Amino acid sequence: MVFQSFILGNLVYLCMKIINSVVVVGLYYGFLTTFSIGPSYLFLLRARVMDEGEEGTEKKVSATTGFIAGQLMMFISIYYAPLHLALGRPHTITVLALPYLLFHFFFWNNHKHFFDYGSTTRNEMRNLRIQCVFPNNLIFKLFNHLILPSSMLARLVNIYMFRCNNKMLFVTSSFVVCVRMLLVEWAFPLFQLFLVMKV
């Protein structure tokens, strides 16, 4: 009887240590960081669903790369306070947003005239359209705080600052979850598509 209560007590203690460990907390908040859905997912979804053909595949890769770069910048801003403060200031967002909005509304919406250079080849114009998809997804990911603000980033920063003593292990475990999601969601289907196209 004493031996069973000793084993049960040690098992409960071990479970509590595992649940309250930095790795589990990092994995949990890594999931929250990965799944914080905002309006930037609409651009990614548009590029992945609507475009077809060779140009569509290149746009999908460009949109996914821009989205991942924006997600990585937001993820780094959680753990790097100067970047978090820079992205949170209204003047920084204005400096980023004004040229983007001017370009987007005056040139991109008028793309028939904007891409009509006269002496350029079709591939050069197509490459310019594909290259414009990358900054569109990257910058719009940073605009999440301006357009539809979410308290997810602020909560993660506060919990990170007050919860964990071993900050490097927390960052590593959070990053492992984000990389795993990236591999499962985007890299593996692209690899399958590559294998199908080779055969």
From Swiss-Prot:
One Pfam family linked to the record: Ycf1
Tell me the domain of life.
Eukaryota
Disulfide-bonded cysteine pairs: these are none
Gene Ontology cellular-component terms for this entry are: mitochondrial membrane
Q: What parts of the sequence cross the membrane?
A: 22-44, 65-87, 91-108
Regarding the membrane, this protein is recorded as:
Multi-pass membrane protein
Q: Which keywords has UniProt assigned to this entry?
A: Membrane, Mitochondrion, Transmembrane, Transmembrane helix
Q: Where in the cell is it found?
A: Mitochondrion membrane
Q: Which InterPro entries match?
A: TIC214
Q: Give the family, as the similarity comment puts it.
A: Belongs to the ycf1 family.
Further facts: A stretch of 270 kb of the mitochondrial genome is duplicated within the centromere of chromosome 2 resulting in the duplication of the gene. The expression of this duplicated gene (At2g07739) is not demonstrated.
For this entry, the protein name equals Uncharacterized mitochondrial protein AtMg00370
Its source organism is Arabidopsis thaliana
